[in-house]
Amino acid sequence: MPIATINPATGETVKTFTAATDDEVDAAIARAHRRFADYRQTSFAQRARWANATADLLEAEADQAAAMMTLEMGKTLAAAKAEALKCAKGFRYYAENAEALLADEPADAAKVGASAAYGRYQPLGVILAVMPWNFPLWQAVRFAAPALMAGNVGLLKHASNVPQCALYLADVIARGGFPDGCFQTLLVSSGAVEAILRDPRVAAATLTGSEPAGQSVGAIAGNEIKPTVLELGGSDPFIVMPSADLDAAVSTAVTGRVQNNGQSCIAAKRFIVHADIYDDFVDKFVARMAALRVGDPTDPDTDVGPLATEQGRNEVAKQVEDAAAAGAVIRCGGKRLDRPGWFYPPTVITDISKDMALYTEEVFGPVASVFRAANIDEAVEIANATTFGLGSNAWTRDETEQRRFIDDIVAGQVFINGMTVSYPELPFGGVKRSGYGRELSAHGIREFCNIKTVWIA
């Protein structure tokens, strides 16, 4: 079955690609497996030179990469360029820090009856990455940069609607100097993942995607006893308390909700506002959301572009329609736009009761649900009333309230007076059904290593 690039702003097919055959996939795995034998022996200094050269190319080609991303999945050009530059930063971070992050960890040898004892980090081998379309370069680089700097080799199975981004990443890594076979893109369907992951030459996997996709890959990896990192969905809370800077909170709330056209696992989705400031927040928030310009993502004046897929747009529309039918109030937006492409307007919904699906579920589009909380206890209760636990945000100047949110929100991340963002320097991941394992920081690179205990008499 062909793999197509479809412009979500028009719905038109731009380019089609032929999927890899079983023999081509087998050859790619064999090439990676052979390459690992010598690549793992390369020095950190050599890998760092290749990583920095890759970063140089990403920076030099940021405009071209941005245009490609925008064409394939609809994010605005500004957001796409920022993503390309962030990828360069990710490669540079691991180029600079990998050797220190993976240094031997000495133990007190005398206490274990040895002359020397330590833990040594060693690469796992061939790693399969199953990546989504919403951040087509950054999500893959969050895997590629640490995995390669640790001495592993990678196979990328990207979402089928972003083939050009997937091929570009393998190309830019090769042009950066990494040897042939270190990083390969496989243009295959999701149905091919199981056979690849079960192949004994593949040592581990990482997946960013939906909960069902994570369950599938997690089950296969569990059966094969292969280490896996899963970063799945999120229904992130954004709490606003009376002591917060309200205007700053509203501004950040808008950005947090519509970033990437609302299609981010760490986008703020459920806005939980203290009753004392609820009306003021809603008025300001609705006004700002309604004023956003929806349009051509290549237009620099556009704030919100199309959703990446027609199915995604239809799912968002149905979630809003179901909420309205159940009694929720649509404060702005809420209707499909009569134009080509897969656009959906910024939408704010209030009066959501606990029995509505929207109370807990994730909406992957520019739709904000706003909840009223009588006190901090109720704010925390609503924040945790979801099966997900990826990111979270809380706005308050009160240090006691800040500590409460840090301690009691069940999530992999909490941002106080800001919005959840991924940084190379900070661990990224979730709890509950948002997955397990961590990306980025020291934790992310160590996920791709075996720590070997060394004891010398």
Swiss-Prot record:
It comes from the Bacteria. Its EC number is 1.2.1.79. The keyword Cytoplasm does not apply. Pfam families: Aldedh. It is an enzyme of class 1 (oxidoreductase). Keywords: NADP, Oxidoreductase, Tricarboxylic acid cycle. One of its GO terms (molecular function) is succinate-semialdehyde dehydrogenase (NADP+) activity. The active site is at residues 231, 265. It catalyses: succinate semialdehyde + NADP(+) + H2O = succinate + NADPH + 2 H(+). NADP(+) binds at residues 133-134, 157-160, 209-210, 232, 362. GO terms for cellular component: plasma membrane. One of its GO terms (biological process) is tricarboxylic acid cycle. SUPFAM superfamilies: ALDH-like. Belongs to the aldehyde dehydrogenase family. NCBIfam families: PRK09406.1. Catalyzes the NADP(+)-dependent oxidation of succinate semialdehyde to succinate. It is believed to be the main source of succinate semialdehyde dehydrogenase activity in Mycobacterium. NAD(+) can substitute for NADP(+), but enzymatic activity is three times reduced. This is Succinate-semialdehyde dehydrogenase [NADP(+)] 1. It comes from Mycobacterium tuberculosis (strain ATCC 25618 / H37Rv). The gene is gabD1.
